[in-house]
């Protein structure tokens, strides 16, 4: 994550919103992901340095929350809920069909970089089989 002067200003303004700088970890991870498409090892280092933390502390947050991607994602990112209820309502079949159609596995990206897929947890399983795109 090579930082421009503008990026530094944005990151500093994010940090300044919080009484304790470490509270800015998640917003900074969101910012890094918005720049690079995913959270890179370099962005972990930059965030840790800006917050006076160990890289392991920032990495722990980035790996705990599933919204932070650790590798490249496609231009179109598709998530399919495969929790028990959604699986019963067709989530597994939908996911398997997508994998077969696209020729990729979970967290995979098509060769052209256009589409990536992943398992998600929708928390709305009682309502319908949940699929999300470009979140």
Language-model features: locations:
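Short beta-strands and strand-loop turn motifs
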Residues: 25-29, 79-81, 130
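Key DNA-contact positions within bacterial/archaeal DNA-binding proteins
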Residues: 56
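Iron-sulfur (Fe-S) cluster-binding segments and ferredoxin-like electron-carrier domains
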Residues: 78, 85-101, 130
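Surface-exposed, interaction-prone regions with an acidic/low-complexity signature
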Residues: 1-38, 46-49, 60-68, 93, ...
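Immediate flanking context of iron-sulfur cluster ligation sites
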Residues: 60-80, 103-124
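N-terminal Rossmann-like NAD(P)+-binding subdomain of aldehyde/semialdehyde dehydrogenases
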Residues: 41
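Conserved small/polar residues in nucleotide/adenosyl-binding loops
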Residues: 128-134
């Amino acid at each position: 994550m090579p930082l421009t002067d503008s990026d530094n200003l944005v990151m500093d303004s994010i940090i300044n919103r919080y009484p304790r700088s470490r509270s800015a970890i998640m917003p900074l991870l969101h910012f890094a992901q918005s720049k690079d498409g995913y959270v890179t090892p370099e962005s972990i280092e930059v965030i840790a340095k800006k917050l006076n933390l160990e890289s392991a502390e920032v990495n722990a947050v980035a790996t705990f929350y599933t919204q932070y991607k650790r590798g490249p994602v496609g231009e179109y990112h598709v998530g399919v809920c495969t929790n028990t209820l959604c699986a019963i309502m067709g989530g597994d079949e939908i996911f398997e069909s997508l994998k077969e159609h696209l020729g990729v596995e979970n967290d995979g990206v098509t060769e052209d970089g256009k589409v990536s897929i992943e398992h998600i947890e929708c928390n709305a399983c009682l309502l319908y089989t949940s699929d999300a795109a470009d979140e």
